[in-house]
From Swiss-Prot:
It comes from Stenotrophomonas maltophilia (strain K279a). It is a peripheral membrane protein. This is High frequency lysogenization protein HflD homolog. Gene3D superfamilies: HflD-like. PANTHER family: HIGH FREQUENCY LYSOGENIZATION PROTEIN HFLD.
């Protein structure tokens, strides 16, 4: 199956949108519930091979697509977000090369999905705590570590930390998808124009 630049920008939008919520909750203690569910649901769709299967309707990634739109036009308002995204893309490389960690994450996701099904809510605090703990026990030990800055008052709260880690897990999942779709760092150097056009098509 061949994939297009349109598919790849949707995966990048998934990364950007998850990290936008990381930044938001780290600064304010609050997140967008719909965006969090989109991110968490993508983690559970481990066997999906296209961004449509992973994220559902492209409108679910609208805020992520807008972030990409602004970034490619040097209109981004959060200079930390691209740095976080780069860290996630680098972390994904280490993650997929560590078979033991991949297996642990896969098993943990299965358990969390059963929990979400029982609770009937993928955004339930217990599910986020489960996924956050999974990230802390596995991917967070790989280098480079994704360093999240924010308000110390909120970063000292267990629920906030768990949600941030769950969202980081979702960002890594989107990065894995991006690679599977043929994404590479060269896209940002030589495929920028095509990516801008693809983002505009998805937002149209």
């Amino acid at each position: 199956m061949s994939f297009t630049v349109d598919d790849r920008v949707l995966a990048l939008a998934g990364i950007a949108q998850a990290l936008q919520q990381v930044r938001r909750i780290a600064d304010t203690g609050h997140s967008d519930a719909a965006a969090v569910r989109t991110a968490v649901d993508s983690v559970f769709r481990v066997d999906a091979s296209s961004p449509q299967e992973v994220f559902g309707d492209r409108h679910a990634l609208k805020s992520g697509l807008r972030l990409l739109h602004n970034y490619f036009r040097s209109q981004g308002q959060d200079p930390i977000l691209p740095k976080l995204a780069l860290s996630v893309l680098q972390l994904e490389r280490r993650f997929v090369q560590d078979g033991a960690t991949v297996n642990k994450v896969a098993s943990g996701i299965e358990r969390a999905q059963r929990q979400a099904n029982e609770l009937g809510d993928s955004g339930h605090p217990d599910v986020l705590a489960n996924l956050g703990g999974l990230y802390a026990d596995t991917i967070s030990h790989l280098k480079p570590r994704v360093m999240v800055q924010g308000n110390p008052h909120y970063l000292g709260q267990a629920g906030v930390v768990a949600e941030i880690r769950a969202l980081l897990l979702a960002a890594v999942r989107a990065a894995v998808l991006w690679r599977q779709l043929g994404g590479s760092y060269w896209d940002f150097l030589f495929g920028r124009k095509a990516m801008i056009e693809a983002v505009d098509r998805q937002l149209a």
